[in-house]
Design a protein with these regions (language model features):
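A short Gly-Trp-Pro
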Residues: 1-136
């Protein structure tokens, strides 16, 4: 049974999750902006054991400002970034919200790294606001 599913732009990479997201949040850090080409990135976090993917993915790993390995997984055909992993949070997958089929489940609870946000980006004042990364 799939709670939610998604794919890359060309449909070569598909995934499903058999659980609800643990948390959904927007990240405004410089690295997320540059990796996505957007003013911020929305991620749905799930346990890796609840994630099933079909299709070939390639990856790119870089160091975060905190010194963790950040690995981005993307479709080698269309280039869509589908999900990521942070070595500082083993067993957790960060699914890129733009790839999710069930758009109605995308309800972020917080904005991260507001100190780095693009000044013209509107911010939903109903969400928790974090200047950096929260400890939990």
């Amino acid at each position: 049974m799939s709670i939610f599913s998604g794919s890359c732009l060309c449909g070569s990479v598909n995934y499903k999750s058999n659980s609800d997201p643990l948390v959904i949040q927007n990240c405004h850090c410089d690295q997320c902006r540059k990796a996505t080409g957007s003013v911020y990135l929305t991620n749905l976090f799930i346990k890796e054991e609840n994630f099933e993917i079909t299709g070939e993915v390639h990856n790119y790993t870089h160091l975060s400002d905190a010194g963790n390995n950040m690995t981005k997984y993307f479709c080698p055909k269309c280039g869509s970034q589908v999900f990521g992993k942070n070595s500082g949070r083993p067993g957790i997958i960060a699914i890129r919200a733009g790839t999710v089929n069930e758009k109605d489940i995308i309800k972020p609870i917080r904005n991260l790294f507001l100190k780095s946000k693009v000044p013209s980006t509107p911010i939903n004042s109903n969400l928790e606001a974090c200047e950096g990364m929260p400890l939990n």
